[in-house]
Amino acid sequence: MPEQAANEQSLKQFIGRDKGLDIRTIHALRILKRSIDARQRTIYVNLKVRLYINEVPQDEEFIRTIYNKVEGKPQVIVVGAGPGGLFAALRLIELGLRPVVVERGKNVRDRKIDIARISREHKVDSESNYSFGEGGAGAYSDGKLYTRSKKRGNVDKILNVFCQHGASTSILVDAHPHIGTDKLPRVIENMRNTIIECGGEVHFETRMDSLIIEKNKITGIETNTGKTFKGPVILATGHSARDVYQWLYDNGVEMEAKGIAVGVRLEHPSMLIDQIQYHNKNGRGKYLPAAEYSFVTQAEGRGVYSFCMCPGGFVVPAASGPHQIVVNGMSPSNRGSKWSNSGMVVEIRPEDLSDNSLFTEELKTKSEELK
């Protein structure tokens, strides 16, 4: 039951009765996995735990990655300081290479000032906003940790790296891990500090304007500051850097359109979602988190689904340029808002589009224009 799962002593007593153990021998327990089963009127919290019988834990709650010094090592240019770029830089350090991260936006703290101006003054800095800047689009729009991709890679390692840099170890446990917009900036700063302390570089307000191509080989980048950076290049530019994709297209780089999803963001009272999901007119009570939902259906043979559900959160203006109307959702770590929201989108397939591989970018641009 939720109230038992929330109290360590109650949990020890429950396990002792269930397994026939003297609870005095249970010196500690560690929750390894946690999920909520709300399919029936009686709500259960499913836990996987590790017991320490007549011993105290000696192991850490997360696995640390060793990052060695890379001064003087071959350098690799990483364009973009969102999650893709930051994790690419950390991985390069593991491989004994020196990352040089180039980010068009500002550092995560200065970026917050520009984001506040969007709501307060209705002014959008096209280089520093909800999409551009250290931490990428997720830094100030929720910090949810999940992937729909079937090519998942080592998700556990990613979560452990986040914990190593200050995220709560609850992300290793919860079925739907979430750091929270209020906690994530500090984690991102710590990741940047690791990169710099190991001998890497991070350059803010430095936009890649073009790739340097010599003898049909990429050898570096040119930036808006006039400075060039030489070395192999990793593009981690995210979904809003349309100028990058236009440059690649104009310079003959082979590109293929991918499907996208287009829709709206819905907002509901958190209490309403809690009442529905937890089958209780009084809502979630003291021991349950703000309720989530996931919606998937087919309409005329086309997928329609909810996306980026933010329980106990806010709808935020997420334009990355002037004359745009774009929104996103976010939740603080406690998910304590009286409102919940979710995207509701329909898939658009490549075959729906023109032969132009940039047509999805053009469609997004037109959809976001304020008219």
Question: Model-found features: residue ranges?
Answer:
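Residues forming the flavin
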Residues: 1-45, 49-140, 144-371
